[in-house]
A protein has these predicted regions:
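Short, Gly/Pro- and small/polar-rich lid/capping loops
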Residues: 1-12
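Flexible C-terminal active-site loop/helix
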Residues: 11, 286, 302-325
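Active-site mouth loops of central-metabolism enzymes
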Residues: 86, 127-148, 166-167, 195-200, ...
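Short beta-strand elements
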Residues: 12-20
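Catalytic core of soluble alpha/beta enzymes
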Residues: 164-302
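Metal- or metallocofactor-binding catalytic centers and their adjacent structured scaffolds
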Residues: 20-107
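N-terminal small/glycine-rich loop or linker at the start of catalytic domains
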Residues: 112-142, 177, 182, 186-188
């Protein structure tokens, strides 16, 4: 994208093996961290996993004794950890949390979306979740024709809306890329753009002004994700919806965003990634906070592009979900 080289990225994969036997085999829950953050093997091996392995069964078991309790496990993983300074710790905990929820759903013999809907949603998961295709990356030798061919492939696969990167080229070149994509998808409302937090305030505002006439789906991460003032100034300067949140890793971070970042409950998009931000347990706290502040959960579009986020979106009734075809 405009900031990092994904070919250099690594990932952590966690398997949580239970003593529950089905069809002659132990049930195992699997988890992996989302794209955009590196593997967390050191934190997992040195701090997070030993705490779980040393916990008693009572420390991890649900109240009825028939399953694991991810919230109890989360508390064990975060024992002896100070608040704040989340760094890569949130990714390590979130990766294990994914594996635990996968295992809990398998023990319950229910899809995770159904389980989440019953526990925290309306009782019934969404039958359909709108999914958009995230692409439009920068590659050597990739011109407008290649970009348009990529977008055509997404439409042929059944996607109705797409997202492309900006900020890795000049503003003039990016506008040409945007116009080339709109020529394929039909109108700007079917296209979102993502700067991956690359811009300073001056450039973020220049892009906001230039993007205004296109009526885009949203303008994503114009500046550093923790620069709430920049985000607020940009949001106030444009009618294009602002999207951000994939690099905020706690309930408190998200609360500060909606307090100080100029985000609007009417059209802004919140993109917190459950696996990168301490997992479903913390994500549920974040959702409760949003509801207290008058935000609909349908403004949430989880980052990640994996099945975990899709099940969360379906189970809790979110707006849409990202796919990385």
């Amino acid at each position: 994208n405009a900031y990092i080289d994904f070919s250099k990225m690594t990932a952590s994969v966690v398997a949580v093996e239970s003593d529950v036997i089905r069809n002659g085999k132990r049930l195992i829950g699997y988890g992996f961290n989302s794209n955009g953050r590196y593997a967390q093997s050191g934190i997992l091996k040195d701090r997070i996993l030993p705490r779980l392995l040393n916990a008693s069964k009572a420390d991890l078991r649900s109240e009825d004794g028939n399953n694991l309790d991810p919230a109890k496990a989360w508390k064990m993983m975060m024992s002896n950890e100070k608040p704040g300074g989340h760094g890569d710790r949130s990714v390590a905990v979130g990766t294990v949390d994914m594996a635990l929820w996968d295992l809990v759903a398998k023990i319950e013999e229910k899809p995770l979306a159904q389980l989440l809907a019953e526990r925290y949603g309306t009782g019934t998961p969404e039958a359909d979740v709108e999914v958009y295709a995230a692409g439009g990356y920068y590659y050597p030798g990739k011109g407008l024709v290649e970009l348009q061919n990529e977008i055509r492939r997404y439409l042929d696969m059944g996607y109705s809306s797409v997202k492309i990167k900006i900020g890795g080229a000049s503003l003039a070149d990016d506008l040409e890329r945007i116009e080339a994509v709109i020529a394929i998808v039909g109108n700007g409302s079917r296209l979102a753009v993502d700067a991956n937090g690359r811009f300073d305030l001056k450039m973020a505002l220049a892009y906001a002004e230039a993007l205004e006439p296109y009526g885009l789906r949203w303008y994503e991460e114009p500046g550093d994700p923790l620069d709430y003032q920049l985000n607020a100034i940009v949001a106030q300067s444009t009618t294009t919806p602002i999207a951000t949140g994939e690099n905020l890793f706690s309930c408190i971070d998200t609360q500060n965003l909606i307090r100080y970042g100029g985000m609007l409950p009417s059209n802004s998009v919140l993109q917190m990634d459950p696996v990168l931000s301490y997992g479903v347990v913390e994500y549920l706290r974040t959702l409760a906070m949003l509801r207290r502040h008058g935000w609909s959960w349908r403004r949430c579009v989880p980052h990640g592009g994996h099945q975990m986020a899709l099940h969360i979106a379906a189970g809790l009734g979110f707006y849409k979900h990202v796919a990385l075809p």
